């Protein structure tokens, strides 16, 4: 999905194991949602 803005979550700690948890944390930060991304499994929020 080209053109999607993603930023690393400020509040999520540790490896991102489930997209659901990441999305919940991101919504708490004011973003639209989020998912686990990359080899390091970082929580990335959707702008």
UniProtKB/Swiss-Prot annotation:
The keyword Disulfide bond applies. One of its GO terms (biological process) is defense response to fungus. Disulfide bonds join 5-47, 16-36, 22-43, 26-45. Signal peptide: none annotated. InterPro entries: Defensin_plant (IPR008176), Scorpion_toxin-like (IPR003614), Scorpion_toxin-like_sf (IPR036574). Keywords: Antibiotic, Antimicrobial, Disulfide bond, Fungicide, Plant defense. The keyword Disulfide bond applies. Fabatins have antibacterial activity against Gram-positive and Gram-negative bacteria. High activity against P.aeruginosa. No activity against S.cerevisiae and C.albicans. Belongs to the DEFL family. This is Defensin-like protein 2. It comes from Vicia faba (Broad bean).
